[in-house]
Amino acid sequence: MDQVMHSAPELMAERPAGTRLDRAVGAALRSLGARAAEGGLQSGVALVPDAAQAFSIRAATARAAGRSLDLMYYVWRGDVAGQLLGREVLRAADRGVRVRLLLDDVFALGRQRVLASLDTHPQIEVRLFNSIKWRAFGKAGFLLEMAFGGWHLNRRMHNKAWIADG
């Protein structure tokens, strides 16, 4: 069986140009693609080297998203970065972008009001991974569940994804 391998520049050349998403993050993606090509990589995957650049790319893609934002996080804190990205996500939803947010339930404890508020938005869907059955009792419920056979609570979602469809 023949496998066709594409480098990042080849894949980018096949994409239709001119979407809002392309204009917002095109330079950053072209830079990553060029670095992949120089290194002879067969995939277009590259790490973003620092937090500031990663933040900028996420904010730009939220602003440029046209159809959907699919977000998956182990932890989304209420710090400055979390609040700023949350604002960008809410603005995208207000523009009509469908937002799906999947969070690990352990780090969603204590944030029920914020998450419930987001979930009332017609364009935002909030889901919790591996929900705590006794979550109504907060952190005490988590500890009780661990004490009484909460072996499943050790299964956490450590993934992070920010996928925008422009």
Residue ranges of each PLM-predicted region?
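N-terminal localization/anchoring segments of enzymes in phospholipid and broader phosphate metabolism
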Residues: M1-D165
